[in-house]
Amino acid sequence: MANFKGHALPGSFFLIVGLWWSLKYPLKYFYQKEKSNQLTHHYQRLEIIEAAIRTLFAVIGILVEQFVPDGPHLHLYHEDHWVKLMNWQHSTMYLFFAVSGIMDMLTYLITHVPLGLDRLVMALAAFNEGFLFYYHVRDRPPLDQHIHSLLLYTVFGGALSLAVEVVLRDNIVLELFRTSLLLLQGTWFWQIGFVLFPPFGGPEWDQNSHDNIMFVTMCFCWHYLAALCILAASYSLVYCFLTRVKRPEDREVIGIQKLRSDHTYRKALLSGSDEE
């Protein structure tokens, strides 16, 4: 949809998944670092639930793009012209992400699925998004082209990271890098909506102003800095939470050891006095 809601919807989806990943990957990393098996019991179930939710998000996106009042309603061609190709492009983007979610579920439900195929399909979905957006804004005003082209850095960067993860699976650095780009993508979709379609009746941006292009470029850097801050805060939050949870257990173990040592000392002292 060529309006504010059409950019806020995917932006919200990417933000929700990005915030979840910013908590999930540090949690998985700390448990793997401690070589703890506590998480393995529930981790696969979490992955399946996440994949199902991402698939649901994609299906909702397709339905919204197709069946809004001015949408194509599944009509691609009518009489002598194409019908709402922009909505069809957005639907195609969502379709690939739905396939990615389904592949993620199959990876954890069926043991015969090759490991790494889920990452490969997700990389293809991200590449497809970038490919569509590259040709999405041709022959548009300069500011419109520029603000959408900045989005390509996050999309193709995420696709590249996912492609590397096919080989280097469970690499925390790659996972956090991908998460930061997804957060950036989510906030930037919202920014595009505010710039091109001001929701509160504000003044429209001059689409041909070079100063506006310079500001938008700088604003993109600010968005990424904000994404990194969110990621750092989530990482620290998970670390502090796990440290606090483990502390009572450590105290309990230390207390038991101390009681045992005190009991052994008293027993040795009593046996020594009996001999005297």
UniProtKB/Swiss-Prot annotation:
GO biological process: innate immune response
Disulfide-bonded cysteines: none
TM regions (residue ranges): 7-27, 48-68, 95-115, 147-167, 181-201, 213-233
One Pfam family in the UniProt entry: DUF716
Gene Ontology cellular component annotations, sorted alphabetically: endosome membrane; Golgi apparatus; lysosomal membrane
Residue positions, PTM Phosphoserine: 271, 273
UniProt membrane topology term: Multi-pass membrane protein
Top-level lineage group: Eukaryota
Cellular compartment(s): Endosome membrane; Lysosome membrane; Golgi apparatus, trans-Golgi network membrane
Keyword terms: Endosome, Golgi apparatus, Immunity, Innate immunity, Lysosome, Membrane, Phosphoprotein, Transmembrane, Transmembrane helix
Function, as annotated: Plays a role in innate immunity.
Record-stated family: Belongs to the TMEM45 family.
Name of the featured protein: Transmembrane protein 45B
Taxonomy of the source species: Eukaryota, Metazoa, Chordata, Craniata, Vertebrata
